[in-house]
Amino acid sequence: MSASAAPASAIEPTRRAASTGQSADDRPTSRDQSENGDATRAVSGFNGNRRVPPPVNEPVRSYAPGSPERAALKERLHSMADERADIPLIIGGDEVHTGELVDVVMPHNHQHVLGQWHKSGAENVDQAIAAARRAARDWSNWAWEDRAAVFLKAAELLATTWRSTLNAATMLGQSKTAFQAEIDAACELIDFWRFNPHYAQSLYDEQPLSDRTMWNQLDYRPLEGFVYAVTPFNFTSIAGNLPTAPALMGNTVIWKPASSAMLSAYYIMKLLEEAGLPPGVINFVPGDAAMISNKLLAHRDLAGVHFTGSTAVFNSMWKTIGASMSTYKSYPRIVGETGGKDFIVAHASADPAALSVAIARGGFEYQGQKCSAVSRVYVPESIWPEVRDRTVAIMKDIRMGDVTDFRNFMGAVIDSRAFTKIGEYLEHGRKNASVVSGGVARGEEGYFIEPTLVETKDPAYRLLCEEIFGPVVTAHVYPDEKWTDILKVVDETSPYALTGAVFSRDRQAIRDAALLLRNAAGNFYVNDKPTGAVVGQQPFGGARGSGTNDKAGSKLNLVRWISPRAVKETFSPPTDYRYPFMAEE
């Protein structure tokens, strides 16, 4: 790809390119070639307890007219749109060009090709496994502070010279607006890379009690084998966090990025290389999901899976792993964040203005393609007319179109498959419920679907139960006096339990919702939309059909990527096998 594809500071000499005919198995990394090849050589020569810089959430830039960040982003959008990125595999630090190419297109202008990515073959997956194994010999023995320094450096690069590049790639390749890209590709990913070292430090600080005769210690070892990271299209920050969180804890990773978010994923990989990530620690392997998963999930060195995607795919992977348990060296750690059917339930005391804004923002930002997006709402009869009218007025005011036009609130849905699926739900709504506003899909230029509000009298209606993953919100209106009854309906309607919110100005009603919906959402909001979790503030994840609830952006997630070893050293070992009770009286 051309040098203009990344900021000047982000360009480094390209490592040796490799074709599919070259075997990665026998090619040593630069660290394998270092003096003596001793596995302990990377332990830092440093005396002192080091502390990572205290993490602070990255401020969200406004991109207001006249601001320097707006000008820089506009310039990068223009230059990136004119480039045709050539996106290779990156295995053991080598760029692999397979020649089997797939186009990267703009969802909001699907005739515009941004570049092409090389599709991996089975032999490339084998090469990635070998590269991960080689890198683990060294990386697992780095002092944790040195590993943390790589990701702290990556955070600083993203906060400065790489910010416009990653935001532009997310906007053009995933059809996010400038604001949605900023809070995702910039701020949240920066936060992951700053907060995770802080959480790792806290974890490593946890040591057992000892007395004067012994020293008890916990050795927080990485897992034995490789971690398989499978990342989604809808959040660049998740694409960056899923491979790097296990890597921070000393693991090596094979990363399969989403085919519909390849441009931003590639730039993440190049940023990490500039930050000093050693070859083979993370291996970038785009390609057919089924082929890659079949290879990796059958390998004895599979140590973990870090996944974000559909519930059906995660269930299939879990089933495959369960059927292969006799294959593995250790029990694989399986961490997943999957589907959602996220709700807002309103009490009669709710503020209609705040509720309407929450429905519009929570349901239609990023075209409803957030895992946490509002998809179903329950509103009492007494306030529904005002809530409906306010929400429709907002919807009529929303602009939708090319995300490089900063006046637009919405872009396009991600691809033709999503466009078709959402269109089928719209048709179902027209035939079986009442479409209050929206409901139009236009796919000639981009995959555009209007923000849509559907009303139904049936609390078990299909659009209230199934994940749509688009800008479609379905409302059920209930009698005011049925408050506790509707809470039970909310809890039992969906198999998912990711996010949800209650709107009320009555504290008892809030207490009712918090209790009866305790297991209905892993992230629960009071008088706020159920989207926009911030690292360090609202650790994210849900249970039931929404995943393993291992809370990305917290210490809880990092615990899954270590295998502790308890070490006891005795200073005065016994010299007599007999115990005192054995003595004669």
Outline where the language-model segments fall:
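Hydrophobic face of alpha-helices
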Residues: 126-129, 148-155, 163, 167, ...
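Residue-level signal for inorganic ion chemistry
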Residues: 111, 132, 147, 250, ...
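Conserved C-terminal structural/oligomerization subdomain of aldehyde/semialdehyde dehydrogenase
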Residues: 2-52, 58, 62, 108-117, ...
